[in-house]
Regions:
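Bacterial N-terminal signal peptides
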Residues: 6-16
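Positively charged n-region of N-terminal signal peptides that target proteins for export
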Residues: 1-5
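Thiol/disulfide oxidoreductase modules built on the thioredoxin-like
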Residues: 132-188
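N-proximal helix/coil linker or "cap" segments that precede and/or mark the start of modular domains
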Residues: 18-40
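Short active-site neighborhood of thiol/selenol oxidoreductases, capturing the structured segment around
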Residues: 54-77, 81
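Short loop/turn microsegments at loop-to-beta-strand junctions
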Residues: 38-39, 61, 160-162
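A short beta-strand-turn-helix
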Residues: 41-61, 85
């Protein structure tokens, strides 16, 4: 390899790194620096297939955790994500929302499909055994409270409510806390889609 070829390759690599760093700085969400590979998992998907994160390489993934009986934070989050996906217009097909339950006692694949379908039929839910779900929560730093009794019977759960932004190569790129609107997700997803 000639010196000229080496210099060209080095400058291209440096330029690409600089562009990615500049794009990361423009993200609204908190950035993972450096990005790291998102832990894969194997759960029951609400679409009837095995749910593996690696199945969605080539798409940007928004990974969230919650449960179908949640009455406040979860439906608001899913409404925001549905609006963001809609606002992506033609790029919507390059985004996958994955929503993993924190309530294995009540959320099976059928219930997750019905619940998520009310927001966007493209959303995929993940359910599984308590040990399977606990392992995924540990990998992603998701905490869940013990069951909190509610008037009239039943229970509620408190849980971490941030959303992971995973790029097309399967790397954790950013973490969006609860409370951001659709425009912030659209902004960050468009940046990740350019890379």
């Amino acid at each position: 390899m000639t010196i000229r070829a080496l210099l060209l390759m080095s400058s291209t690599l440096l330029f690409g790194t600089a562009v990615m760093a500049a794009d990361d700085a423009a993200l609204v969400a908190g950035v993972f620096n450096p990005p790291r590979l998102a832990p894969d998992f194997s759960l029951r998907g609400s679409d009837g297939a095995e749910l593996k994160l690696s199945r969605y390489r080539g798409k940007v993934v928004l990974l969230a955790f919650g449960y179908s009986s949640c009455e406040a934070v979860c439906p608001i989050t899913l409404g925001v994500l549905a609006q963001a996906r809609k606002n992506l217009d033609a790029a919507a097909g390059q985004l996958q929302v994955i929503y993993i339950t924190v309530d294995p006692d009540r959320d099976d694949a059928v219930r997750m499909r019905t619940f998520l379908g009310g927001f966007d039929p493209s959303f995929i839910g993940g359910s599984g055994t308590p040990p399977q779900l606990a392992a995924v929560r540990t990998d992603y730093g998701i905490s869940v409270s013990d069951k909190i009794p509610v008037p009239g019977g039943g229970y509620a759960l408190n849980h971490s409510s941030f959303i992971y932004l995973i790029d097309r190569s399967g790397k954790l790129r950013a973490l969006m806390p609860y409370g951001h609107g659709p425009d912030d997700f659209v902004h960050d997803v468009r940046i990740l889609l350019k890379q």
